[in-house]
């Protein structure tokens, strides 16, 4: 899914790049009595929200590529390219058609992948994992377990499967006959997963980790958040391992969890982007895009407004202080006069 999204985003950027980088007077289309130039097209699309997003991403990726591009190897790019291709083909699509639909060639797509990889490298360069981060990761961690699963379409089917197993049915045989999970069905539902695995839904992991060896779960409902379809699972635990109290044997896994958690934290990501844009001295020259990066950087007008507010606040505080001092002096003088008259 991630590669699919990258491909789609790359397509949007490719269209915008074409308009932004081509000669403004060049004709894109001609017709009787009129033409459409690159400038016409650019002025039309730049106000659209998708163009604002594409521009924002273009600037961010360019900044990160300039600074972190040398950390990305051709091997990294080819690996990401192959993964994207495999994913499209696994879903029955043709990769060349997907590229054409996005307005890309293999060369331009690889360029986009390099920018994305440089962006990822830039985020990782800012990572600082604390002991608190590790403790948080440890709290939700569960070591890898060995289990068997049966996936079915309805709750009634799941209840029927559970009853069949309870009545002495062989789990492996039932999985091969009735499970709809194509990845595990042939092997009798056998699967391994830990708390970070994406091969099984979170609901299934949560229920499975509570099972003892040999125990079979009740039907578990799991909703796919992309399709909003609910499927049902019955799980048999083969080998469940308690993590204990010592984090050290799982140090590598815990650190990875902490890093992934921070990289998914939008506050962290926004701060990194903001710092990098500031360091690169990014200036927006076209008013149509002055707010495209507003979430990451202050515009000159907003900065001036902020300074003006601070100045007013400071003047107000100074005035209040002077007034207070004057009142104190008047009060003191009054008391002195009263004392003299007495």
From Swiss-Prot:
Comp. bias regions, Basic and acidic residues: 306-330
Keywords for the protein's UniProt record, in alphabetical order: Cell membrane, Isomerase, Lipoprotein, Membrane, Palmitate, Rotamase, Signal
Coiled-coil residue windows: none
Amino acid composition bias (Low complexity), ranges on this chain: 331-342
Region spans: Disordered: 297-342
Signal peptide start and end residues: 1-20
Any one Gene Ontology molecular-function term assigned to this protein's record: peptidyl-prolyl cis-trans isomerase activity
EC number from the UniProt entry: 5.2.1.8
Disulfide bond residue pairs: none
Phosphoprotein listed as a keyword: no
Lipid-anchored residues (N-palmitoyl cysteine): 21
Protein origin, superkingdom: Bacteria
Subcellular location per the Swiss-Prot or TrEMBL entry: Cell membrane
Catalytic EC class: isomerase
Catalytic activity, reaction form: [protein]-peptidylproline (omega=180) = [protein]-peptidylproline (omega=0)
GO BP, sorted A to Z: protein folding
HAMAP family, per the entry: Foldase_PrsA (MF_01145)
Function text: Plays a major role in protein secretion by helping the post-translocational extracellular folding of several secreted proteins.
The protein, known as: Foldase protein PrsA
UniProt source species: Enterococcus faecalis (strain ATCC 700802 / V583)
Name of the gene this protein is made from: prsA
């Amino acid at each position: 899914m991630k590669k699919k999204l990258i491909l789609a985003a790359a397509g949007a950027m490719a269209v915008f790049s074409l308009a932004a980088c081509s000669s403004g007077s060049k004709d894109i289309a001609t017709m009787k009595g009129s033409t459409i130039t690159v400038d016409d097209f650019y002025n039309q699309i730049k106000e659209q929200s998708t163009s604002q997003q594409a521009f924002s991403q273009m600037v961010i990726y360019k900044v990160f590529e300039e600074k972190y591009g040398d950390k990305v190897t051709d091997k990294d790019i080819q690996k990401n390219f192959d993964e994207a291709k495999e994913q499209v083909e696994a879903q029955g699509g043709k990769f060349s058609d997907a590229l054409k639909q996005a307005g890309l060639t293999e060369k331009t797509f690889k360029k986009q992948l390099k920018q994305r990889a440089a962006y990822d490298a830039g985020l990782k360069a800012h990572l600082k994992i604390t002991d608190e981060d590790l403790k948080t990761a440890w709290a939700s961690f569960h070591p890898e377990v060995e289990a068997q699963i049966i996936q079915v379409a309805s709750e009634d089917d799941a209840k029927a499967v559970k009853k069949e197993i309870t009545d002495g049915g062989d789990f492996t045989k039932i999985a091969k006959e009735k499970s709809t999970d194509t990845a595990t069905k042939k092997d009798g539902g056998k699967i391994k997963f830990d708390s970070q695995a994406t091969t099984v839904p979170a609901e299934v992991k949560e229920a499975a980790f509570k099972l003892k060896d040999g125990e079979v779960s009740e039907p578990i409902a799991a909703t796919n958040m992309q399709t909003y379809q609910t499927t049902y699972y019955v799980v048999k635990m083969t080998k469940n391992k308690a993590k204990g109290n010592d984090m050290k044997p799982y140090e590598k896994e815990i650190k990875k969890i902490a890093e992934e958690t921070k990289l998914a934290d939008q506050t962290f990501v926004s701060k990194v982007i903001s710092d990098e844009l500031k360091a690169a001295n990014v200036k927006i020259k076209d008013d149509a895009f002055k707010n495209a990066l507003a979430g990451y950087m202050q515009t000159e007008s907003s900065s001036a407004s902020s300074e003006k507010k601070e100045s007013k606040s400071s003047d107000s505080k100074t005035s209040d202080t002077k007034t207070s001092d004057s009142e104190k002096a008047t009060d003191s003088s009054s008391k002195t006069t009263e004392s003299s008259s007495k």
